[in-house]
């Protein structure tokens, strides 16, 4: 009977699974039985563990000592940062300068009054040879007038003056130059919508060169006409002076009676004439 009961219990235990979790708390002193005489060992162990914990806490609370390499490296990185910022600033400033150079200057119409003001400023500065674009710009003091405008106009004015230097038709040349300037302004207004990088820019440059060549030809023709006029006037003056020198006063007189010349109508070669 006992054998049968034990077999039945074994079968029942094998058929029903064990669903217990078997959770146990960690026991650091499992191998050591707790007896009355071993309290000193447990107290010493607990004291040693507490001392270890306090030592660890003090270790974490105490400030760490270092040799200073990290701090020195941090200072060096801080020292290099302004240089990097300076380089970035230089790069940004250079990019801004490039953008300003790429931006096209607005067109300026040189009217007759503005050109007269320009000529007056150049004359006050001592002529076109001594005047500089910056000084002319400061003396004119015109709104929306840039240094590039004054520089190009002064260069054109110098070329016209140098080609027609010393010619008597200087006023005519200035009028022709003003007319050419107005024609160039009209051409620029007509081509204002086109871009400088377009293929039409070459044709515009050709027309400007043709206008410059035509102004030079006109100035040369005016100067040649003036010189020819001077040559004719000088030639007529020389002829008049020659005619004046050929005319002499008749200061001839004879010695003797006044009726002697009437008696002898035919002049003889032996008569002596005194000329003064």
Swiss-Prot record:
Residue ranges constituting the HTH myb-type domain according to the UniProt record: 102-162
Keyword Transcription regulation: yes
Bias kind Polar residues: ranges: 195-220
Keyword Transport among record annotations: no
Keywords annotated in UniProt: Developmental protein, Differentiation, DNA-binding, Nucleus, Transcription, Transcription regulation
GO biological process: abaxial cell fate specification; integument development; plant ovule development; regulation of DNA-templated transcription
One protein family per Pfam: Myb_DNA-binding
MF terms (GO), sorted A to Z: DNA-binding transcription factor activity; transcription cis-regulatory region binding
Single GO cellular component term: nucleus
Composition bias, Basic and acidic residues: 171-183
Biased composition annotated in UniProt, kind: Low complexity: 39-52
Location of this chain's protein in the cell: Nucleus
Tissue: Expressed in the periphery of the primary root apex and lateral root.
Region (Disordered): 30-52, 161-220
Biased segments, Acidic residues type: 185-194
InterPro entries according to UniProt: Homeodomain-like_sf, KAN_fam, Myb_dom_plants, SANT/Myb
Disruption phenotype: Ovules with a single integument instead of two.
DNA-binding feature ranges: 133-158
Role this protein plays: Probable transcription factor that regulates carpel integuments formation. Required for the specification of polarity in the ovule inner integument. Modulates the content of flavonols and proanthocyanidin in seeds.
NCBIfam families per record: myb_SHAQKYF
Note: Plants overexpressing KAN4 show reduced or absent ovule outer integument and color alteration of the seed coat.
Name by which UniProt lists this protein: Probable transcription factor KAN4
Organism: Arabidopsis thaliana (Mouse-ear cress)
